């Protein structure tokens, strides 16, 4: 028969011995690491721990439902507030999401960030707030344009000033050198649209006045000649544009003046351009046409053509 009393007695007899064993194990556990680390090693470890700096990371997409809601065009709540020019609401949203770079730099279906839209809608104050909150000025839209490209294309000097003065020097250098998917820098776009104030401002900030677009190798000065803009030509020359820089086909800005109405541009460039870059190169087709005065014996035209049973007279 099973006797509970007997087992209780056995447990009582073994109790003190087990308690002593447990006490020894605890003592061993506490003392096992004693003197395992020297003082100098400990001090070095403390020093290294103090020098650890956590790297800032982009905040993950927040769990708030309004942050995750998108339209069919991929616009977030912030995109829509900027599009509809709800400035008070926009500033409130920016204040709430400050530091959430994933949300601030979110791109819609046209790859436009809120900063792109602030420039497109001509809201430089909103653009400044977005930049201070952490928006990236180097992100590109579906045409490869940064927000500064758009500001130069639209001729908005206020937006250009905000974008160039609020961003960091590293961002500014990168944006000034960046080309869109047509190969145009911000300076090219400002030149194409004839915004002289923006051109001068960009060059002052360090934009390369002799940068060549990749399609034909034209500089801003070549573009100014193409557009027949004498004031832009004068400004670019004042800013140090190279009059002897040639396109990929070998044409100087002066050579592009031939056959064009502005004699003022031709006079401006003619005084500075090398002599060998002033005359147009002769076309190979024209040379071959001029030297070919008569047909050779093997190249005489046919004189026995028959069409519909009738002899043709050439």
Swiss-Prot record:
(3S)-3-hydroxyasparagine PTM sites in chain numbering: 210, 244
One Pfam family cited in the UniProt record for this chain: Ank_5
Reported modifications of this chain: Phosphorylated at Ser-32 and Ser-36 by IKKA/CHUK and IKKB/IKBKB; disables inhibition of NF-kappa-B DNA-binding activity. Phosphorylation at positions 32 and 36 is prerequisite to recognition by the SCF(FBXW11) and SCF(BTRC) complexes, leading to polyubiquitination and subsequent degradation.
TM ranges: none
Location(s) in or outside the cell: Cytoplasm; Nucleus
Span of the annotated motif Nuclear export signal: 45-54
Residue ranges with Basic and acidic residues bias: 15-39
Listed GO biological process terms: B cell receptor signaling pathway; canonical NF-kappaB signal transduction; cellular response to cytokine stimulus; cellular response to tumor necrosis factor; interleukin-1-mediated signaling pathway; lipopolysaccharide-mediated signaling pathway; liver regeneration; negative regulation of canonical NF-kappaB signal transduction
Segments of this protein annotated with the region Disordered: 1-39
Cross-link Glycyl lysine isopeptide (Lys-Gly) (interchain with G-Cter in ubiquitin), sequence positions: 21-22
List of residues that carry Phosphoserine: 32, 36, 283, 288, 293
Induction of its expression: During liver regeneration.
Modified residues (Phosphothreonine): 291, 296
Motif range (Destruction motif): 30-36
Keyword terms, alphabetized: ANK repeat, Cytoplasm, Hydroxylation, Isopeptide bond, Nucleus, Phosphoprotein, Repeat, Ubl conjugation
One Gene Ontology CC term in the entry: I-kappaB/NF-kappaB complex
Family annotation (PANTHER family): NF-KAPPA-B INHIBITOR ALPHA
Function: Inhibits the activity of dimeric NF-kappa-B/REL complexes by trapping REL (RELA/p65 and NFKB1/p50) dimers in the cytoplasm by masking their nuclear localization signals. On cellular stimulation by immune and pro-inflammatory responses, becomes phosphorylated promoting ubiquitination and degradation, enabling the dimeric RELA to translocate to the nucleus and activate transcription.
Family stated for the protein in its record: Belongs to the NF-kappa-B inhibitor family.
Subunit text: Interacts with RELA; the interaction requires the nuclear import signal. Part of a 70-90 kDa complex at least consisting of CHUK, IKBKB, NFKBIA, RELA, ELP1 and MAP3K14. Interacts with NKIRAS1 and NKIRAS2. Interacts with RWDD3; the interaction enhances sumoylation. Interacts with PRMT2. Interacts with PRKACA in platelets; this interaction is disrupted by thrombin and collagen. Interacts with MEFV. Interacts with DDRGK1; positively regulates NFKBIA phosphorylation and degradation.
Protein name according to UniProt: NF-kappa-B inhibitor alpha
Lineage, broadest ranks: Eukaryota, Metazoa, Chordata, Craniata, Vertebrata
């Amino acid at each position: 028969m099973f006797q509970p009393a007997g087992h209780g007695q056995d447990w009582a007899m073994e109790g003190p011995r087990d308690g002593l064993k447990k006490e020894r194990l605890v003592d061993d556990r506490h003392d096992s690491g004693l003197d395992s680390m020297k003082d100098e090693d400990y001090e070095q470890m403390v020093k290294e721990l103090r020098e650890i700096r956590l790297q800032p990371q982009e905040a993950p997409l927040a769990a708030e439902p309004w942050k995750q809601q998108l339209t069919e065009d991929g616009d977030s709540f912030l995109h829509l507030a900027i599009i509809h020019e709800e400035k008070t609401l926009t500033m409130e949203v920016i204040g709430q999401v400050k530091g959430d770079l994933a949300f601030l730099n979110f791109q819609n279906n046209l790859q436009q960030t809120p900063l792109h839209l602030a420039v497109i809608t001509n809201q430089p104050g909103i653009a400044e707030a977005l930049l201070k909150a952490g928006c990236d000025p180097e992100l590109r839209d579906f045409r490869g344009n940064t927000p500064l490209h758009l500001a130069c294309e639209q001729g908005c000097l206020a937006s250009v000033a905000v974008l160039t003065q609020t961003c960091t020097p590293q961002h500014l250098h990168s944006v000034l050198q960046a080309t869109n998917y047509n190969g145009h820098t911000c300076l090219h776009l400002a030149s194409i649209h004839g915004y002289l104030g923006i051109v001068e401002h960009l060059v002052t900030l360090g934009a390369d006045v002799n940068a060549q677009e990749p399609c034909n190798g034209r500089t801003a000065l070549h573009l100014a000649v193409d557009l027949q803009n004498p004031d832009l030509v004068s400004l670019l020359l004042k800013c140090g544009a190279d009059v002897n820089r040639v396109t990929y086909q070998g044409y100087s800005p002066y050579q592009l003046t031939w056959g064009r109405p502005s004699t003022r541009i031709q006079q401006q460039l003619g005084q500075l351009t090398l002599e060998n870059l002033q005359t147009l190169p002769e076309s190979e087709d024209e040379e071959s046409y001029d030297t070919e005065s008569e047909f050779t014996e093997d190249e005489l035209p046919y004189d026995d053509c028959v069409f519909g049973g009738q002899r043709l007279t050439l």
